[in-house]
């Protein structure tokens, strides 16, 4: 998100929440979406708190420009937060450094192993409220490349996603080079949650979800 603000890359993956800040410089591709289909960022606590109790606590979050934080604000309104690296939130809550944390990425699958409690799944909340998927991440391309090059790059990205879905084992092995040391089963489950047909094309309901979310 920060590098996109500085236009450092021609193509970048960003949080959907951050897109309005870069819309003058970047176009949102119709491929590369990460959307929660009835699941998403989770609020967890080191004890069994109700949502009302949790709202009064300081919440560890992965960033102010993350889609997870926007979903939290939409669901809970104005709350007290502190930003931590996303991979430090779950252990910090488990160790009692924070009462409540907002977890993303593989933490959505591993939180039960850390002895914490689920307070709310914001993907469930969003789906129940809107009937739409929760838009979390997207791919953007820099506008100064020109429409023709932007279109070509978007098509290349789409083809790469289609290829990875056709040969997921090879794609997962390649992706592990940039992984965070999670085990193969967790890695596969997480990828299957967020890389699917909607990653090839948002779909009309996916595009509607982005407009409503922002």
Please give the residue ranges for each predicted region:
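Bilobed "Venus flytrap"/periplasmic-binding protein-like clamshell domains
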Residues: 39-100, 106, 208-212
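Beta->alpha turn/N-cap motifs
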Residues: 4-20, 85-86, 103-109
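Short active-site-proximal "capping" loops at secondary-structure junctions
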Residues: 1, 17-21, 33-35
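Pocket-lining segment of extracytoplasmic ligand-binding domains
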Residues: 86-176
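Secondary-structure end/capping motifs
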Residues: 146-214
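Conserved beta-strand segments of alpha/beta enzyme cores
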Residues: 27, 80-82, 117
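Hydrophobic/proline-rich hinge and linker segments of small-molecule sensing/allosteric domains
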Residues: 28-50, 126-144
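A residue-level signal for conserved active-site and pocket-lining positions in enzyme catalytic cores
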Residues: 4, 72, 153
């Amino acid at each position: 998100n920060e590098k996109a603000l500085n236009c450092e890359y021609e193509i970048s993956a960003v949080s959907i929440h951050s897109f309005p800040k870069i819309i003058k410089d970047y176009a949102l591709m119709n491929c590369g979406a990460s959307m929660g289909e009835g699941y998403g960022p989770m609020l967890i606590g080191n004890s069994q708190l109700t949502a009302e109790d949790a709202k009064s606590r300081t919440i560890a979050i992965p960033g102010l420009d993350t889609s997870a934080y926007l979903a939290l604000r939409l669901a809970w309104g104005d709350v007290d937060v502190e930003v931590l690296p996303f991979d430090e939130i779950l252990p910090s809550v488990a160790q009692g450094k924070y009462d409540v944390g907002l977890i993303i990425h593989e933490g959505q699958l591993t939180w039960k192993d850390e002895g914490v409690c689920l307070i709310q799944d914001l993907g469930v909340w969003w789906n129940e409220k809107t009937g739409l998927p929760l838009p979390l991440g997207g791919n953007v391309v820099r506008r100064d490349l020109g429409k023709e090059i932007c279109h070509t790059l978007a098509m290349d990205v789409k083809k790469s996603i289609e290829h990875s879905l056709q040969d997921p084992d090879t794609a997962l092995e390649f992706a592990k080079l940039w992984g965070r040391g999670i085990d193969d089963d967790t890695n596969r489950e997480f990828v299957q949650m967020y890389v699917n047909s909607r990653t090839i094309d948002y779909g009309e309901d996916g595009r509607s979800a982005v407009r409503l979310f922002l």
